[in-house]
Amino acid sequence: MNFETTIGLEVHVELKTKSKMFSPSPVTYGQEPNTQTNVIDWGFPGVLPSINRGAYQLGIMVGLALHADITRLTHFDRKNYFYPDNPKAYQITQSEKPLGTNGWVEIEVDGKKKKIGIAELHVEEDAGKNQHEDDGYSYVDLNRQGTPLVEIVSKPDITSPEEAYAYLETLRQIVQFTGASDVKMEEGSMRVDTNLSVRPIGQEHFGTKTEIKNLNSFVHVRDGLAFEEKRQQAVLLSGGEVRQETRRWDPDAKETLLMRVKEGADDYRYFPEPDLPPVAVSQKWIDDIQASLPQPPAERRQRYIEDWGIPAYDAGVLTQTKEMSDFFEATVAQGADAKQASNWLMGEVSGFLNAQHVELGQVALTPAHLAGMIKLIGDGTISSKMAKKVFKEIIQHDTDPDKWVHEKGLIQLSDPAKLTPIIDEILDNNQQSIDDFKAGKDRAIGFLVGQIMKQTHGQANPKVVNQILMAEIKQR
C-alpha cells in the first residue's frame, strides 16, 4: 500500500518592536526574569490594554511580503485557557477575522518549484515562560508575556519533510528581509508547530493527524516529520489506527515520543476582546507599507544571476540574509567586481564570521574597504596572497586598505625593470634548474619561482615573474 503525506505548519514569529503588543513594557531578550513587565502583563484587575500600532504595521508588512490579502476591518479576540505562564487566563489574539488570508510562498525542492498556500496570519501576544529547576520548584518568567507575534498558518499543501524544510527556510528569508523580525530560532523569535497525517493514495479525507513538539531547528523539524511519517505508515500497514496525539521529538534517540492523547479539539471559548477597539486598515496604510518593502530574496537572486552573472548557488548563499545581501550590493556599488565580491563574502568573510561566532554587523569590515581591497588585487597592486594579510587587518580594524598597503610596504612588485636583475641573479646561481627545465622537468620552474619570491619577500607579481623567467631562460 502506498501513502501520501499531508503536513501543516504553524509558525510563530516574534515581531521586532521596542515594546509589547498591548502594554508599554520593553521587549529585550536575555534580561533577568520578570524585569520587563508591568501590571498589564501580570493581568491585574482593572488595567486596560492598548494596541501597539507599530507591531500591527509589522504584521501587515509580513502579510504583504507573503502575498496575503490584508483584512481592512478586523478585531481582536480572547482565547481562554489557564496555564501558569498566562496570568490573565486568556490570550489576546485574532480568531474570527485574522490580519491576512490567502497568502503563498514559492519553494524549490530537487530543482522543482511549488507554491505553498498560507491560510491565514494573525497578530497576537506571546505567553510567559515556565522554568522547571533542579530544586523541585517551577518558576514563571513573564518577560516574554505580551511580546507581539504574528502566527503564520500554512494550507495543507506540504507533502514531505523536505518540502516542510524548504518552506520554513523560504519563510525565514522572506520575513527576515522585511526587517519585521530577526527570526532566530535559538532566541525563540521563530517557533514551529507541526501537524502530520498520512492516508492511502486515493483516499479523499485526511488521515488522523499528530502534533510534534520540541522542534528547535529546521533540521529537527525535517527529521521529526520524517520519523513520524514512517511511524504512521507502519501503524496503518500493521492494521492499527493512528491516534490524535501530541508527541515530542527526541533528537538524541531520533524518534518521536508520546506526550498526551488528544480526544477532541480544544475549546478556547473565543469571543471578541471587549477592552480593545476594532482595527481599521486604510488602503493608504497598506500602500505605504507595500512601497517600503525591500526587494524579496527570490527577486534579488534572479537579479544577481541576470545582471552580474553570479552562479545560482552563489546567489542563493548571498541572499540567505538581508545583511549579507545588502553588504554584497554595497560592495559592488563601491566599484568591486561582482564575482570577486561574491567569492570573498562566501569564502574568507563567512569563514571568519563562523570561526568567531559573530555576525557581519559585529566586525569592522565595510563595503568600501572590501571593495578597495578587491580593486587593489584587480589592478595588480597586491597579490592574492598579500590580500589575505590585508583582509585580516580590515575585518578587525577600521583600516583603509590602500593606505595600509602603502604604509606596510606590501605593494606587489610588477616593474620588469626591477624584477629582471633579481631573476637574472637567481638564474646565474641555478644553472642545474635551467637544464632540468629544458630537459622537460617542469617542476624546475616552480623551484626558480620560489627562489624569486623568497628574494622579494613574496612581493613579486607571479604573472610578471613567469613572463620574464621564460623569456630569460630562452635566451640562455
Swiss-Prot record:
Heterotrimer of A, B and C subunits. One of its GO terms (molecular function) is asparaginyl-tRNA synthase (glutamine-hydrolyzing) activity. InterPro entries: Asn/Gln-tRNA_amidoTrfase_suB/E (IPR017959), Asn/Gln-tRNA_Trfase_suB/E_cat (IPR006075), Asn/Gln_amidotransferase (IPR018027), Asn/Gln_tRNA_amidoTrase-B-like (IPR003789), GatB (IPR004413), GatB_C_1 (IPR042114), GatB_Yqey_C_2 (IPR023168), Gln-tRNA_amidoTrfase_suB_CS (IPR017958). NCBIfam families: gatB, PRK05477.1-1, PRK05477.1-2, PRK05477.1-4. The gene is gatB. This is Aspartyl/glutamyl-tRNA(Asn/Gln) amidotransferase subunit B. It comes from the Bacteria. Keywords: ATP-binding, Ligase, Nucleotide-binding, Protein biosynthesis. It is an enzyme of class 6 (ligase). Its EC number is 6.3.5.-. Signal peptide: none annotated. It catalyses: L-glutamyl-tRNA(Gln) + L-glutamine + ATP + H2O = L-glutaminyl-tRNA(Gln) + L-glutamate + ADP + phosphate + H(+); L-aspartyl-tRNA(Asn) + L-glutamine + ATP + H2O = L-asparaginyl-tRNA(Asn) + L-glutamate + ADP + phosphate + 2 H(+). HAMAP family: GatB. GO terms for biological process: glutaminyl-tRNAGln biosynthesis via transamidation; translation. Belongs to the GatB/GatE family. GatB subfamily. Allows the formation of correctly charged Asn-tRNA(Asn) or Gln-tRNA(Gln) through the transamidation of misacylated Asp-tRNA(Asn) or Glu-tRNA(Gln) in organisms which lack either or both of asparaginyl-tRNA or glutaminyl-tRNA synthetases. The reaction takes place in the presence of glutamine and ATP through an activated phospho-Asp-tRNA(Asn) or phospho-Glu-tRNA(Gln).
